[in-house]
């Protein structure tokens, strides 16, 4: 009689362990900053850097920064005069379709995958000081 009880307890403990491991949350899809860093390297770094202006402005600190405000970068009039502060929601929309957010801006680029957009924004947010 003792052996079946030990087996039941062991089986229950193993089952709970497996459920716990399988059920661990990794966060919402696309919100991982590490994944965003990879997407940024593949999709964004040709024109942008985190710390210096390239074809596009530097992006470190973009979350919470006024649009079109990086010193020394030649923004389009539309973006320079947009008058908003970048937040996560607006950056996701921007990456989805820049022209839908600010018409006639100089960046014509889209990230069609929603998880990739969210991941890039999570990465950019992680760079905010």
How would you label these PLM feature ranges?
Residues 16-22:
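Hydrophobic alpha-helical membrane-insertion segments, chiefly the h-region
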Residues 40-50, 120:
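The canonical Cys-X-X-Cys-His
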Residues 33-37, 49, 53-87, 111:
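Gly/Gly-Pro-rich "capping" loops immediately C-terminal to redox-active cysteine motifs
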Residues 22-40:
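Electrostatic cytochrome c docking/interface patches
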Residues 87-129:
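C-terminal capping alpha-helices of c-type cytochrome domains
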Residues 2-13:
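Bacterial N-terminal signal peptides that target proteins for export
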